[in-house]
Amino acid sequence: MTIWVDADACPNVIKEILYRAAERMQMPLVLVANQSLRVPPSRFIRTLRVAAGFDVADNEIVRQCEAGDLVITADIPLAAEAIEKGAAALNPRGERYTPATIRERLTMRDFMDTLRASGIQTGGPDSLSQRDRQAFAAELEKWWLEVQRCRG
């Protein structure tokens, strides 16, 4: 099992949580980005640099992730594809995407894209709060406990 991170858009504070978790869990953590990243020295943490371009990092994560892996992303289509492959998906605010919720999220994303294309200003997400960081850490821990239970 591996934790895959859509690292270009992942907040640094979330990456820090993931670095500590990878060490504690002794779980491979792969940060996929189209730029060089600095990560702490660890046998569990590595970076995968991809070419710049639209969805290049996302496509690489989808190509390499497997059932049982965890994908960290705020990108709804990437989360949907990861779930289709049997991976779990979690956004940096601590929301776990599920097969039941991802369809709704895709519909809302498409609706917001339509609004923006018609010239309506929809605004962006709020900045990451302490509550978001705590929710992320809690949901990551919950996923890890599920993995441990399945392993036996």
From Swiss-Prot:
<dbReference type="InterPro" id="IPR003791">
    <property type="entry name" value="UPF0178"/>
</dbReference>
<comment type="similarity">
    <text>Belongs to the UPF0178 family.</text>
</comment>
<dbReference type="Pfam" id="PF02639">
    <property type="entry name" value="DUF188"/>
</dbReference>
<protein>
    <recommendedName>
        <fullName>UPF0178 protein YaiI</fullName>
    </recommendedName>
</protein>
